[in-house]
Amino acid sequence: MNIIVMKFGGTSVGNISKIKNVAKIVAKEIKKYKIIVVLSAMGGVTNKLQKYIEEIGSNFASENDLILTSGEQVSVGLLSMLLNKMKIKSTTMLGWQVPIITDSCHEKAKILNIDNKNILNSFKTNNVIV
């Protein structure tokens, strides 16, 4: 099984039309590969969330991480929905579902290990993991 990783930043997923374009790009590679898609939050979302955190004045790094990752989760869900609507079997995975093991340094964590068993199992029934 050949697997590729495709990464799209905030500008590439800035609105639904752009997410549809990403889905088309992914669809072109489906015949050759199983695909892992990594997405940023939609353009401007992370900045907006950061402003909310600053307004509250939070010094709680774990909550900051939780809030900031919500932007990526929206993009991931929307793309997976579009791919499935296009009849491309897709599922979503968050870091803890993979799992990706990091150190405990919130906001600046380093990856210690990626256990790929869940990814490989998911590819038995899906063509794309977002």
Residue locations for each model-derived region?
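Nucleotide/pyrophosphate-binding catalytic subdomain
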Residues: 1-130
